[in-house]
Regions:
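Extreme N-terminal "head/tail" segments of very large remodeling/mechanoenzyme assemblies
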Residues: 1-156, 181
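Extended, Lys/Glu-rich alpha-helical coiled-coil stalks
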Residues: 160-190
Length: 190
């Protein structure tokens, strides 16, 4: 008999590093990240760490991947900073998400956990972000509306809708409050 566990089934990345939009599928047992230098292995692993550690501190990012021109930070990943000093999203306002889809192998209940960011073109540090979770799988639109990543307000709306859905594992309990962790590190109840 298999031991029940929680497994990553998929990961969605919108506007992180050199990745504009990517859905990754994971195998239950083994996942191999391979590729040439600069192909994005550390980019994906750092995205996973931002969600799992619940921190935007550069201390959790892969320091070995830094180069002389660029020190990795969450903001540099969000902007899509390149080795030549340019950035994919350097001069625009944009939103970004990193989401992990997790399935309980015993109950087959699926939950998504993630981080959502809003960055203005003039931002020199990270000002608007939130960590979130919701029941059910990654939505079919992959957190995009008209090919534009959801804002934090849209993430909040989705989370509230999912809390009332049949997919919600706590559907027998009325959840009237949702907790969002803001960039101040303090909880705010909505």
């Amino acid at each position: 008999m298999k031991q029940p566990k929680k497994i990553f089934t998929r990961m969605l990345i919108n506007n992180w590093g050199g990745i504009s939009h990517k859905m990754l599928e994971f195998h239950e047992y083994v996942n191999l990240f391979s590729g040439k230098s600069g192909s994005g292995k550390s980019t994906v692993m750092d995205a996973i760490q931002v969600v799992l550690y619940g921190s935007v501190s550069a201390n959790f990012l892969n320091k070995a991947a830094d180069d002389s021109k660029n020190k990795r930070s969450v903001l540099s990943y969000l902007r899509g900073a390149q080795k030549d000093g340019t950035a994919n999203r350097g001069d625009v306002d944009f939103c970004s998400q990193i989401v992990l889809e997790i399935e309980d192998t015993a109950t087959h209940i699926v939950t998504c956990v993630g981080a959502a960011f809003e960055v203005a073109k003039g931002d020199t540090d990270l000002k608007k972000y939130t960590y979130f979770s919701h029941s059910g799988r990654i939505p079919k639109d992959e957190y995009l509306e008209n090919n534009v990543p959801y804002s934090i307000a849209q993430i909040r709306k989705l989370t509230e809708e999912r809390s009332r859905s049949a997919d919600n594992r706590g559907r027998g309990i009325r959840r009237k409050k949702l907790i969002f962790i803001r960039c101040t590190g303090k909880s705010s109840v909505r």
